[in-house]
A protein has these predicted regions:
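Hydrophobic, well-ordered secondary-structure segments
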Residues: 109, 113, 117, 137, ...
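S-adenosyl-L-methionine
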Residues: 5-11, 15, 21, 37-50, ...
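Non-catalytic nucleic-acid substrate-recognition regions in nucleic-acid-modifying enzymes
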Residues: 2-134
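Residue-level detector of conserved catalytic or cofactor/ligand-binding positions
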Residues: 190-199
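Beta-rich nucleic-acid/ligand-interaction surfaces
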Residues: 133-142
Length: 200
């Protein structure tokens, strides 16, 4: 299986090291995300142990699209029945487009949802879906007309782990805070005071 781990821009190298430390093979590093290979256990392990990732997605497909028709056909060509059961609740939770001809997130989401419905109608021989079962949110990234689609396994964003137990005037996302610490020479045998006062 192939997975996508989005992260804050500039933290790709930190996330890559985390993934390698978990024992998984990184297949690509791009702006704001790292793609890696793993088995089904990687879904749980990545969601629990990756401190700098925003979420973990199962990569379900990728293709080139410059028009909404190409987006529709590419999305419909994905075997959604392998991921979404007949009663599954599915939607495109987020669409991000950078330097692509298709740039309207709401239009991208709408076209993709229609394509998913058309695919599942053909497979399940149904005209209407109650979507009363488990949730299957989908996320899509467009970069220079290259479309990458992932199925979200995380739910609430991973930056909300331990969310706001202690508040401050300028709170920082937990995954960003973890990345900042990982970029310092600190290790578990040192107190954090060594970061700001290295002479102590």
């Amino acid at each position: 299986m192939e997975f996508i781990a989005p992260c804050h821009f500039g933290l790709e190298a930190v996330l890559k090291k985390e993934i390698l430390d978990l024992g998984y093979e990184v297949s690509s590093v791009e702006d704001g995300r790292v793609t890696f290979a793993g088995d089904e256990n990687a879904i749980c392990r990545a969601n629990v142990f990756l401190r700098t990732a925003e979420r973990v997605l199962v990569k379900v497909g990728s293709f080139h699209a410059e028009t909404f028709e190409e987006l529709f056909q590419g999305t419909r060509g994905i075997a959604w029945e392998d991921y979404v059961p007949e009663d599954g609740k599915f939607w495109v939770a987020k669409a991000a487009s950078i330097k692509s001809r298709l740039f309207s997130p709401s239009d991208i989401q709408s076209i993709m949802k229609k394509a998913m419905v058309e695919r599942l109608k053909t497979v399940y021989h149904k005209e209407w879906f109650a979507e009363s079962g488990a949730s299957f949110p989908v996320r899509v990234f467009l970069l220079k007309d290259e479309v990458v689609i992932g199925l979200d396994t995380t739910g609430e964003s991973l930056h909300k782990r331990g969310y706001r137990k202690l508040t401050a005037k300028a709170p920082i996302a937990e995954n960003l805070a973890a990345a900042l610490i990982m970029l310092t020479p600190w290790h578990k045998d040192l107190s954090l005071i060594h970061i700001s006062e290295p002479t102590r």
